[in-house]
């Protein structure tokens, strides 16, 4: 099921991302850079291991994980979190927990588009990606 997410995805549109970063506790300067950055996300699937790479002029991150198995992750804004990623109803659901907080990142593919919905409390941000040729 994770194979549906495999590919190279380029950010084309972002809504409410600054508010989401603010809710995470990201500082002003980092939010300014993060808001202007147009990252590329590369998702690779090899057997039961999924690798998710995010590349931008600001920062590159890479995580490898098995669906349904909790793992330690250091986020692009340097939070140390416990992450769990599952496939639920055709969506890739990524839950990050740290310091009594929780955020959910949901990826959904439709054709050559990937929609990422970021939720923290009542703050919701959507980031739209298009698959690279």
Swiss-Prot record:
InterPro entries: Calycin (IPR012674), Fatty_acid-bd (IPR000463), ILBP (IPR031259), Lipocln_cytosolic_FA-bd_dom (IPR000566). GO terms for cellular component: cytoplasm. The modification N-acetylalanine is found at residue 2. SUPFAM superfamilies: Lipocalins (SSF50814). CDD domains: FABP3. Its main location: cytoplasm. The keyword Phosphoprotein applies. The modification Phosphotyrosine is found at residue 20. PROSITE patterns: FABP. It comes from the Eukaryota. FABPs are thought to play a role in the intracellular transport of long-chain fatty acids and their acyl-CoA esters. This is Fatty acid-binding protein, heart. It comes from Oncorhynchus mykiss (Rainbow trout).
